[in-house]
């Protein structure tokens, strides 16, 4: 991102509202910053609507230079904001209610897709700036339906967003197929993409790079960790080939996580890779993917090739 320098790893705050009290949330963000991870990804939808305010409160007294992405397009479901605070004490006392409680909490995390009306995007950006207590560095459309993403009204408000200083860069998150067409059609406002790139769902990031579009990728761990564990456990041949061609012991799950992040960083060398954790020690392990990498470029290429050659079906959760 030639106009903006952001850290190679970014910390996603989609689950921060459920990660404990404010002191713990502050510790997570502080751990990330101390480890050199200074880009943070939030949205009005994240944390049941609380993620932006939590991050803003934490960063208010932060002396370091950090960057922030926020979004427009998804909102938290319209349920009481203190649902989890009510449910958790009940969960502790009445174990038989656990299944019902989990369903209620999961429902509270379902997004409401925002129907666009003129002025909505700018109003959302203003609300985000108040919660964050700073302008966003990057402002993305958040998985918006195609008809809105390509409308003149939305494109016009994104232009206005940059003019008013609410964001340095604008872009869009979503599926690779949609992003390709939208970025080519409106490169001035869709100059940043956010999309999945993982072992199980690889993206052609070269297309965006050659088009002058910056990429922020996510779901590397979610789209790789379980699949690799499945192959190591249930397909002995995979482990044998891995040992011969990659030569790295990943029986330690923390090492496996670092390897997955290193692959994601290798495949998005000009961009940023997002991850998330509610454990400070895991954040430090993630940072090692940048500071003390375990893999060479040849090993990264070998992992992608090996996975594509051997992996034929998604993990069978019946095992």
Where are the model-predicted features located?
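N-terminal binding-site loop/beta-alpha segment at the start of enzyme catalytic domains
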Residues: 1-89, 163
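A short alpha-helix capping/helix-coil boundary motif
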Residues: 5-9, 35, 104-105, 135-138, ...
């Amino acid at each position: 991102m030639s106009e903006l320098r952001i850290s190679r790893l970014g910390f996603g705050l989609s689950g921060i509202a459920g990660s404990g009290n404010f002191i713990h949330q502050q510790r997570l963000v502080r751990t990330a910053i101390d480890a050199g991870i200074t880009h943070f990804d939030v949205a009005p939808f994240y944390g049941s609507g609380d993620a932006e305010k939590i991050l803003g409160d934490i960063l208010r007294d932060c002396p370091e230079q950090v960057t922030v992405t926020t979004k427009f397009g998804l909102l938290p479901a319209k349920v009481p904001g203190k649902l989890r605070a009510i449910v958790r004490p009940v969960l502790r006392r009445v174990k038989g209610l656990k299944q019902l409680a989990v369903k209620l909490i999961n429902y509270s995390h379902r997004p409401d897709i925002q129907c666009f009306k003129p002025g909505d995007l700018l109003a959302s950006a203003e609300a985000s700036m108040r919660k964050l207590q700073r302008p966003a560095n990057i402002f993305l459309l958040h998985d918006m339906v195609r008809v809105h993403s390509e409308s003149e009204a939305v494109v016009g408000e994104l232009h206005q967003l940059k003019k008013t200083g609410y964001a340095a860069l604008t872009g869009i998150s979503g599926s690779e197929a949609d992003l390709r067409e939208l970025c080519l059609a409106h490169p001035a406002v869709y100059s940043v993409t956010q999309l999945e790139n993982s072992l199980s769902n690889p993206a052609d990031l070269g297309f965006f790079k050659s088009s002058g579009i910056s990429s922020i990728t996510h779901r590397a761990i979610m789209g790789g960790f379980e699949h690799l564990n499945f192959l190591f456990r249930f397909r002995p041949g995979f482990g044998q080939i891995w040992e011969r061609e990659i030569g790295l012991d990943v029986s330690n799950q923390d090492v496996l996580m670092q390897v997955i992040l290193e692959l994601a960083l290798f495949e998005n060398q000009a961009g940023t890779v997002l991850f998330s954790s509610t454990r400070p020690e895991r954040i430090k392990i993630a940072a090692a993917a940048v500071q003390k990498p375990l893999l060479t470029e040849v090993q990264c290429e070998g992992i992608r090739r090996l996975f594509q050659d051997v992996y034929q079906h998604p993990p069978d959760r019946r095992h």
